Each structure stands twice: as structure tokens, then as C-alpha cells.
Amino acid sequence: MFVADDPLYLHRLDALEQTWQVWSQLGGSLSETQWSAASRCPGWDVACLYAHHSQFLLALSAPPPHAPDVSGQPQSAVQVLRAFNAPGGVASTAAPAVADQAAREATQHKPAELAERFTGLGPVIIRRLRTAGPTS
């Protein structure tokens, strides 16, 4: 079975598509004052949030990297997330660089450009993921 034929996968894509549509619509409706409003993330305004979250779309729109050769047992998503969020894990060690990148992106792009990532790239990525084979 192709990944794109898995009902759970398709439901998750539906949810992702709806989420990106909301980000797109909300971003398109924000005023300049709202874009520069502080968020709950220290030091980040709304533009930084859009810059950060839209990085996922940029990553998915790029050609996939060559699959690495792996050995050993595969890890579950739970194991990966536990390690990622553990003290000293990537979530904490990479946080300063991630925050800096979001702030840079937010200053380098107009708010409309950040929202457009969800409007323009989102549907293209979702279409590709819906038709992707297991190795696409």
C-alpha cells in the first residue's frame, strides 16, 4: 500500500491542510500592528512565529535529501520526541539558534511574504504528499 492510500495518513494531511489554510487566512488579515505584537514566546513577535513555522513548508518544498544508510532498530516517534525534548536534547541545545533564525527571517521578509508561504506553498506540498509513493 502506498503511504498516500493509508486512511490515517490522509486524515493527517487533511488536518495539516486545514491548519495551513488558517495560518494563511489569519496572516492575510493581520494589521501591521498585529504582526509586530508580542507573542507568548519571549522576544518573538507574530512575524517571528510565522517565520519559524513557515520553515517547515520551505523544507518540504525542497527536493528530499538522499536517504541515509541506517543500521540498528528503528525508533518510534515517542522515542525520538523523548530524546528531542530531554534535558540537553536538541530542543534545548538548538533553541537559541532557532530563535535567532526566526528573528532574522522575520526582519528579512515582509509579513505578506511570510503568510504567502502558507498560501502558495501549502497547497502544492499537500497535493504532492497526497500522491506520494512510499519512497517519494
Language-model-detected regions and their locations in the chain:
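Short, helix-capping/interhelical loops that line the mouth of catalytic, cofactor-
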Residues: M1-H11, L58-P123
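Helix-loop segments that flank and shape redox-cofactor active sites
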Residues: V22-D45, P63-S71, R128-S136
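Phosphate/oxyanion-binding active-site loops and adjacent basic polyanion-contact surfaces
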Residues: A15-T19
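Actinobacteria-biased recognition of intrinsically disordered, low-complexity terminal regions
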Residues: M1-D14, Q25-G28, T33
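Histidine-centered divalent metal-coordination motifs
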Residues: H52
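Hydrophobic alpha-helical core bundles mediating ligand binding, dimerization, or RNAP-core interactions
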Residues: W20, F118, G122-L129
